[in-house]
A protein has these predicted regions:
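Nucleotide-sugar donor-binding/catalytic module of glycosyltransferases
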Residues: 2-281
């Protein structure tokens, strides 16, 4: 019998405008059934969270969901579910203050993807999946590659051109922090692999600056370098089929706003201590 992995799609966004419509539509029309979606609104000012079908849940200033005296999540708003979502579980968090993507994604994984076998898919709110079979393909990929703990790639620009994406050669795992960073959209991994970061760095300082603040951009490098190092070459797989549409038309994209800061943060991350390889993500 085919294994239907639980897939957790985490979608952080800030002022995505009408691009969020494409994102929502691409996620809610998937032909895969065993998946859940968490939208995280980083205090948008364009009222984009009102487009999200489902429930908006209350959480504190650290991004932790707040429960009532019965242990139930507190719903602050309800938006109508589209018929096409069927029994899909859609959740949303609305931040009370700007936090940026990295702490929002971190809190999403730690609170939403608690089973180590969950497959986490990161989808930015101004991007979208390339077709209705994207999640089915991801499920099949992990089933066909049981040794895989992380699968990444590939994507296209909105004009149809393929984005640059390449597999890691094995020799680069001798010093990943000196190698080119190759983790491109679509970014997926077993939740347990991310949880293991906390066993070697319980404060997740690998994702924070010298003052202890979460990095405000370059979240992909901060998140994925530790996971790459812990997993090792044999547990990382590159996918060549485009499953993701990467949208650079949003004028507030990080690489358009402050590219130099991105490079500076990347260099700071590379200078941190590497993580030790692990035997299992569970």
């Amino acid at each position: 019998m085919e294994n239907k992995n639980k897939i957790k799609v985490i979608i952080p966004f800030y002022n995505p405008g009408d691009f969020l419509d494409m994102c929502i539509s691409s996620v809610l029309t998937q032909d895969y059934e065993n998946y859940e979606v968490l939208f995280i609104d980083d205090c948008s000012t364009d009222n984009s969270y009102s487009k999200i079908p489902g429930c908006v849940y209350k959480h504190d200033e650290n991004g932790q969901p707040i429960k009532d005296e019965n242990g139930e999540l507190i719903i602050i708003e309800k938006h109508p579910l589209l018929d096409r979502t069927k029994c899909l579980n859609v959740m949303a968090w609305k931040a009370s203050s700007r936090a940026t993507a990295l702490p929002n994604i971190h809190n999403g994984i730690m609170n939403f993807a608690t089973n180590p076998d969950d497959i986490v898919v990161i989808l930015d709110g101004d991007d979208w999946l390339s077709g209705k079979g994207a999640l089915s393909y991801i499920n099949d990929f992990y089933n066909q590659n049981p040794e895989c703990w992380m699968m990444y790639g590939s994507s296209k620009w909105t004009d149809g051109r393929r984005c640059c994406s390449s597999p890691y050669p094995e020799y680069e795992f001798k010093n990943l922090r000196a190698a080119p960073f190759r983790i491109s959209h679509i970014r997926t991994f077993r939740a347990g692999l991310y949880h293991k970061i906390g066993e070697q760095d319980n404060m997740f300082s690998c994702m924070k600056d010298k003052e202890g603040n979460w990095y405000t951009m370059t979240y992909d490098v901060a998140m994925f370098l530790p996971m790459l190092e812990m997993a090792g070459f044999e547990h990382i797989k590159h996918n060549s089929k485009p499953l993701y549409i990467y949208n650079r038309d949003n004028p507030i994209s990080d690489d358009k706003v402050n590219q130099q800061k991105q490079w500076d943060i990347h260099e700071e991350i590379n200078n941190k201590s590497p993580f030790k390889k692990i035997e299992s993500y569970k």
